[in-house]
């Protein structure tokens, strides 16, 4: 008997791709805010009109789920003072967040926010997605650090998914 409530595979995959694009855009936006001191409203306007789903300097950006993009960026901005100490605790001793490259700070903040607040997304998916985002910018050693830090944060907020310890 066929399951008529089942969604076509393409819809789920398309949503996942749009969320992945939103994560990449969110990290880029957070990086830009960190480096250039841009305000959140300017960032939203710029990314939504010029980046999301458009061609920029010869690169075509995938359409992104704008609401997800906005949630991650605004959530990180709102909760940064709570997120940064969590990330600091998960980093190796002697490597506080302020010593980490700005792009990695953006990746870790976005991932930590999503692990803490976006329970609609499985924790291991969050970690994997942000490792993939980091891979677009840094080498393998640094993506390993992203994986380890987000895994530790995931265990803190989603022990049932990750297993505690």
From Swiss-Prot:
Q: What Gene Ontology cellular component terms go with this record?
A: cytosol
Gene Ontology MF terms: RNA binding
Any Pfam family from its record, for instance, is NusB
Matching entries from Gene3D superfamilies are given as:
NusB-like
- Keywords assigned: RNA-binding, Transcription, Transcription antitermination, Transcription regulation
Query: InterPro entries attached here?
Result: NusB-like_sf (IPR035926), NusB_fam (IPR011605), NusB_RsmB_TIM44 (IPR006027)
Query: Which BP terms in the Gene Ontology apply to this protein?
Result: DNA-templated transcription termination; transcription antitermination
Q: Which domain of life is it from?
A: Bacteria
For this protein, the record's SUPFAM superfamilies field holds: NusB-like
NCBIfam families on file: nusB
Its family?
Belongs to the NusB family.
Q: What does this protein do?
A: Involved in transcription antitermination. Required for transcription of ribosomal RNA (rRNA) genes. Binds specifically to the boxA antiterminator sequence of the ribosomal RNA (rrn) operons.
Q: What is this protein called?
A: Transcription antitermination protein NusB
Source organism of the structure: Bradyrhizobium diazoefficiens (strain JCM 10833 / BCRC 13528 / IAM 13628 / NBRC 14792 / USDA 110)
